[in-house]
């Protein structure tokens, strides 16, 4: 964030005592979509905040997830798994079981990552995952540059594109 950037909260999803809040950050000057990103805005950055709302009068920002190659756009939670459309970061799948505290990336809670770029895409090899929707063992990932990806969940630690 800071001067020269456009920043805002894009999404929030409540699951149990946590609310997962996705922030987006873009340069205030439009950039090319080299390496992925949003046409007209360029690369997205951002953080997924984890807010403990067990006491709604006193919410606490307790954990975060911030990959270096994407921006938290849309999230979906099913059980103890979070599915994240991470713009140029593609699809990310996180284990959100137990207590969530601190940096979820360095704790190894990312259990899967699928880069959704394709050489035949409207912007070749440039992932731009808009969301991730889980339903009946499949994750549906709409990518602005390369179309719809359907990923089968085989187990908590393996995904098959």
Locate predicted features.
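Feature marking well-ordered beta-strand scaffolds used for ligand recognition
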Residues: 1-161
């Amino acid at each position: 964030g800071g001067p020269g950037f456009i920043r805002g909260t894009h999404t929030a999803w409540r699951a149990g005592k946590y609310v997962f809040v996705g922030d987006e950050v873009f340069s205030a000057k439009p950039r090319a979509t080299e390496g992925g990103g949003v046409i007209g805005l360029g690369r997205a950055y951002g953080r997924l905040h984890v807010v403990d709302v067990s006491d709604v009068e006193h919410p606490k920002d307790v954990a975060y997830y911030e990959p270096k190659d994407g921006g938290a756009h849309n999230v979906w939670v099913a059980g103890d798994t979070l599915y994240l459309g991470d713009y140029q970061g593609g699809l990310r799948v996180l284990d959100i079981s137990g207590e969530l505290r601190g940096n979820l990336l360095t704790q190894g809670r990312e259990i899967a990552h699928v880069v959704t770029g394709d050489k035949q895409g409207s912007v070749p090899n440039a992932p731009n995952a808009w969301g991730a929707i889980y339903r009946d063992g499949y994750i549906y990932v709409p990518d602005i540059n390369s179309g719809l990806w359907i990923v089968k969940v085989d187990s908590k630690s393996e995904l098959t594109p």
